[in-house]
């Protein structure tokens, strides 16, 4: 198992990824509202909204919550006006981090992000310095006991997936953004349950951290960023050194 996968496994076990159901619903509702405002409330003609609603259903978000979020976006209900922001950051050990944000007040969020970074040895990067190290990809993660490796390869690659990784009892399916919806639909049609399913920034290469204290700072920094209410997602090129033993 690679260090990047080792880190992902630790995060799943700790429940660090959107651990609270309320946090999941809040983040998805923001995405739905922004998508509806940008492209209208008709899912058929608005791919971004369609993907957000699919994600909401996968998270078992109540139908009323979904409809309310759409109405807020289209102006049918009063709601916050959100601004999309992307923060490019550095963490200790030369690790690069991308932070996706939807905020109703950037003047509040930016100092909060800076504070989280500064307290754990991180900093904001210049525009483009970090984003060039990542690619935008669809990523679907599912437990390997649901389907054989051969069957998944046939199904996912046939639907347009680019790559499939097998790590620690999990499959990670990667797609281009344009093929993400088709691949997700193909997997769902076979009754497969996704642990995670989203379009996110994937690192082209990783930075291995072999010093325990530095690794712990990076992990804490990422967790603190994810805990911020305005943060939609965090991606990094962090790779935990194979010899690093955490408490």
Curated annotation (Swiss-Prot):
Q: Give the UniProt keywords, A-Z.
A: Cytoplasm, DNA-binding, Transcription, Transcription regulation
Gene Ontology CC: one annotated term:
cytosol
Which Gene Ontology MF annotations are present?
Answer: DNA binding
Biological process, per Gene Ontology = regulation of DNA-templated transcription
The protein's location, in the record's own words, is: Cytoplasm
Q: Which InterPro entries match?
A: Integrase-like_N, TACO1_YebC-like_2nd/3rd_dom, TACO1_YebC_N, Transcrip_reg_TACO1-like, Transcrip_reg_TACO1-like_dom3, YebC-like
Record-given protein name? Probable transcriptional regulatory protein LEPBI_I0056
């Amino acid at each position: 198992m690679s260090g990047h996968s080792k880190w992902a496994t630790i995060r799943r076990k700790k429940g660090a990824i959107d651990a609270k159901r309320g946090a999941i619903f809040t983040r998805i509702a923001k995405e739905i509202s922004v998508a509806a405002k940008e492209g209208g409330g008709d899912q058929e003609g608005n791919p971004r909204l369609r993907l957000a609603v699919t994600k909401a259903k996968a998270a078992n978000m109540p139908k009323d919550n979904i409809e309310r979020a759409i109405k807020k976006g289209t102006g049918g209900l009063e709601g916050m006006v959100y601004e999309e922001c992307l923060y490019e950051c550095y963490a200790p050990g030369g690790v690069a981090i991308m932070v996706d944000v939807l905020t109703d007040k950037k003047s509040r969020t930016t100092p909060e992000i800076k504070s989280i970074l500064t307290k754990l040895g991180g900093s904001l990067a210049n525009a483009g310095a970090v984003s060039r190290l990542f690619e935008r990809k669809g990523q679907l993660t599912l437990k390997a006991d649901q389907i054989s490796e051969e069957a998944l390869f046939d199904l996912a690659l046939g639907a347009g997936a680019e790559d499939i990784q097998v790590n620690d009892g999990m499959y990670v399916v990667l797609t281009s953004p344009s093929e993400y919806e088709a691949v997700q639909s193909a997997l769902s049609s076979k009754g497969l349950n996704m642990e995670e399913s989203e379009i996110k920034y994937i690192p082209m290469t990783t930075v291995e951290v072999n010093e325990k204290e530095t690794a712990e700072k990076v992990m804490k920094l990422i967790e603190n960023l994810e805990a911020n209410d305005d943060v939609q997602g965090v991606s990094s090129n962090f790779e935990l050194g194979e010899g690093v033993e955490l408490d």
